[in-house]
Amino acid sequence: MRINTKIRYGLRTMVVIASSTGTEGVLQKDIADSQSISVKYLDSIISYLKLKGLIINAQGKRSGYKLARPADQITMLDIYTAFDRIEVVECLNNENLCPRKNHNCKANRYWDSLKTDFTTLLKNKTLSDIMN
């Protein structure tokens, strides 16, 4: 399983925003500069994080960004699923893709267990944990 670039940049963005102590939030340009991410690409990262309700504008349009809730209430699962669903193998999310769906596939149970374990791992790690 690979963690895609949007998830990695999303986490880095969240860490930068969470590290800010000011009330005015962190400007997108400052995040882009500090993380060597193009402003254009970061625009899409910011959109996903806002849509998921993880960040908000600090003081309206053209202001910086801040966390929508405290860092200890934002999990890695929140960040991960802002960009992608957890998919270990395709047949777990779409049983019509599996020709063995009616044959009690033992491998499917293993993949499902792996997905559950990975989800739990993400759910149990907060942004605050990562920063400390």
Where are these regions (language model features)?
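Non-DNA-binding regulatory cores of transcription-related proteins
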Residues: 68-132
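Key DNA-contact positions within bacterial/archaeal DNA-binding proteins
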Residues: 40
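Short amphipathic alpha-helical interface segments
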Residues: 8-22
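A short alpha-helical element within helix-turn-helix/winged-helix DNA-binding domains
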Residues: 26-36
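Beta-hairpin "wing" of winged helix-turn-helix
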Residues: 54-67
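Short, hydrophobic-biased segments on the C-terminal half of alpha helices
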Residues: 46-47
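Alpha-helical residues within the helix-turn-helix
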Residues: 33, 50-51
